[in-house]
Each structure stands twice: as C-alpha cells, then as structure tokens.
Amino acid sequence: MEKIQRYLQLERSQQHDFLYPLIFQEYIYAFADDRTFSRXXSILSGNPDSENLGSRKKYSLLIVKRLITRMYQQNHFLISSNDSNQNKNPFWGRNKDFYSQILAEGFAFIVEIPFSLQLLSSLGGKKKRVVNSQNLRSIHSIFPFLEDNFSHLHFVLDILIPHPVHVEILIQTLRYRVKDVSSLHLLRFLLNEYCNCNSIITTKKAGSSFSKRNQRLFLFLYNSHVCEYESVFGFLRNQSFHLRSASSGALLERIYFYGKVERLVNAFDKVKDYQVNLWLVKEPSMHYVRYQRKSILASKGTSHFMNKWKCYLITFWQWHFALWFHPRRISRNQLANYFLEFVGYLSNIRTNPTVVRSQSLQNXFLINNAIKKFETLVPIIPLISSLAKAKFCNVLGHPTSKPVWADLSDSNIIYRFVHICRNLSHYYSGSSKKKSLYRIKYILRLSCARTLARKHKSTVRVFLKTLGSGLLEEFLISEEDVLCWTFPKTSSALRGVYKSRIWYLDIICINDLANLK
C-alpha cells in the first residue's frame, strides 16, 4: 500500500473525492492484477483454474489500452442495462464479459485505496508491532476469547446477517464512505451489467455469478454493508448503555486485515457501577462476535432481555436498510443446552462436576465443584457430506476412489490428498474430541489408496502391501512439520499433543472442503 501511495502522489483528502479519474490509468490495472494486492485469482493473470467464461487471456497492456480508449470515446455508461438492446451495447463489443470484469477488478482496487490509507494512518507507530504479530491473523484467535468470556454467560442470539435485496441499498450504504459521485455511478453500471436484475445477492444465479467473477468487489460491497450494520453497536455503546469506551475502527474483513489483530473480537463490557444523578445503572455484560455471514450476541441477562435485543435488531434492519428481515433468522438459545455453529465448529458450554478430597488434621471431607467448560466439536455429518459431494466417499462415509485424479502421477495424487487432509486437520485441531477428526483422516487415506490402486489396476490390499507404510508416512509427515514449527524450542510440548487442544494461529484461509457454508 505504501508503494501505491508514493506512486499516486495524492493527498488523503483527494483520495475520497477524486477516485473516478484513476479508472483511466493503466498502472491501476497492473496493480489490480498483482497477486500481492489480490488473493483471488484474477482474470487478467490467466489462471487456468479460474472460471472466466472460458476466456484464459493473458494480462496485456494492449487490452487495457483498448478498454480505456473506449471509455474516452463516448460515455456509453449512460446506456441502461435494463434496455432491451443491452447486448448490442457498442461499448463492450464482442468481449462484454471480459471487458466488464477487467473494469470491475480495476474499480475494486481503486475503491479500496481510501480505506487502506486510513488504516495505515490510524496504525501510526503501532504498524511494525502489528505486522510482526502475523500469527494472530487467524480466525482461531477468536477461541481464547470465547473460552474466557462465554463460560459465565447464559443466553446467546445466533444471527444470520441479512443481505441487501436491492442494488441501490448497496450504493446508498457506500455513499457514506465514498464521496465521488462518478465512482458510484460506475459501480451502479457494473452491478447492473453483472446481474441485469435488482438483486445481486439473494438471487442464486445472479449472486453466484457475481461472487465468482469478482470476489474482491463482492467482498468489498458486502463488508461495507456489514460495517454499516455494526455501526449500531458503537452508537449504543456510547449512548444508551454507558458501555466502557474502547478504541475501535471500521474494520473491513480482508481489506483492513492487520486491524483484525487487535480488534478481531468486539467485546462490549458493561460498567458495573455507573452513577448518574444518584441512580445506579447495572446492565448485563454483552459480547458481540462476527464471522462471515453469522454473528452472535451473548449475554448473562435474562431471556426477556435477549428478546428485547432481538426485536430491536429486527426493527433496526427494516427501517434503516429498508429490507424485510424474517425473525426466524435470529434464534435465542440458552448456552447450556445449545450447540453454537460458529467458525465451522460446534461449540457448547457444559458443566463438568469434579470431586476434590480435602483433609484437615484427622477429618477428611469431599468437595463437589461444578466447572463450566467451553467445548468445540468437529461437525462430522456436514464434513462427510462435503467429502461425499467431492466424490471422496459415499453419503454413509465409506471411502471411494477419485476417478478424475486417476490419470495424474502418483506423487501428484498423494500430494492432493495430503494437502486436503492437512488443511482439515489443522483447521479442526482445536477440537475437544478428536475422534471425528481421525475418521475424516481415515476416509481421505483410504480414498487415496483406492485411487492409486485404481490407477495401477490392482486391489487396495495388494497395493498397500507393495507400498508398505509409505502412504501412511506421507499423511503423518505433514502434521509433524507443523507441530515442529509451532513448538520450535520446547520438544517436550509434543507430549500428550493429541489430548490437548492446539490452535494453529498461522491459518488464514482453508480448503473449500472445510468451509461448510
């Protein structure tokens, strides 16, 4: 980001008001194509694995120059996408999908510049310290917070964050942060070209096509919407409930990435004794956590208190965002009797009774203690369904071969299975009970063996007898390497590793099989 800031040589104030002229600069598309600034595969890079409508064109300045020339010649953006002759729009020509996606990638990169510059300026002297703590850039950083705080809470609201139904809702939300009117008109044009309808997220076909073609722009729009939705908690913290003031900023996931290090979890702790005009305000402690499309709001208050919060959130969404939100998308549950589906885990708070024998002089007595423990379990049924969908097993969990990979080399087949097994193993390494995780590993190992046996036209038993323990070692080595990296100095920490929970804080993204949503 600093390199871009020096290259553009623009003041922060100008970044907010004059973003649109940058869309005509060639270097913007070069920056957008750079993988350093984009995690998703770009259509400009010609990645063979990306779905780009069959067009695997390499990045070329000539293509960008043609696009810029077309934008300079006429203002074709005035043509409505709802026009019956939209397919004959002379601006796109024959390469409508390709040109529109290039323009969308460039726009997504440009519109992130003000937010990124604001983040760098807010970090200031803390920048180096934040960057050095790269191991904390993980969704697993949320579990220590849950273990320390959720054990004494009573009720939780499990919330599915509502999506905007209309394109104009996204545009209006972004108007509070981007003041360049021309850029907003360009965004409206791109959304209409992508979807040709008023709904870009709720419609399955349109939303799926939009998110797959340009994930970066989709994430930016969605995070802007969520940021506006979460602003209500900051208002309530400072106004209604007299919550303790804490420094917090508008965090956009995957855009304000390093900001998640210090403010990954927004915990709003109540001030226990707050005296105003000789009357005492005592409110239950509230904790708010968000991950992707879900968020949870937990409290140690009563059931009636949580119902009031539920009604308030529904009313807020309907009046502020002008969208209908079904009450069933918010479920109120008691933590002691409810499994919370969060971050791919099934979490629950259980009471474990313990008996302690004490002796004072000649008298011995027993003390019964009830300790609340935060447990995280592997969702075995959704995982097996994901493996069955990927053709690694059937719906009952019996391993099958992968015929599509049978034409690959042996090393490539083993690498692919090990890679998936390693990602799933690392992601669910924090589970309290690892029996379900061992079953997933067994399915992948046997599926790998059956795929290799199918390739060599042999049986699994004969193939494993010929190969020996080599296949098993491939799966185990991947785990040992990570364990050594996690504990580089204390080898004794490896003892009892399968009995305790280990959080792999170096995980940023996981395999699609581990993403149950």
Swiss-Prot record:
One of its GO terms (biological process) is RNA splicing. GO terms for molecular function: RNA binding. Its main location: plastid. Keywords: Chloroplast, mRNA processing, Plastid, RNA-binding, tRNA processing. GO terms for cellular component: chloroplast. It is found in: Plastid, Chloroplast. Belongs to the intron maturase 2 family. MatK subfamily. Usually encoded in the trnK tRNA gene intron. Probably assists in splicing its own and other chloroplast group II introns. This is Maturase K. It comes from Veronica arvensis. The gene is matK.
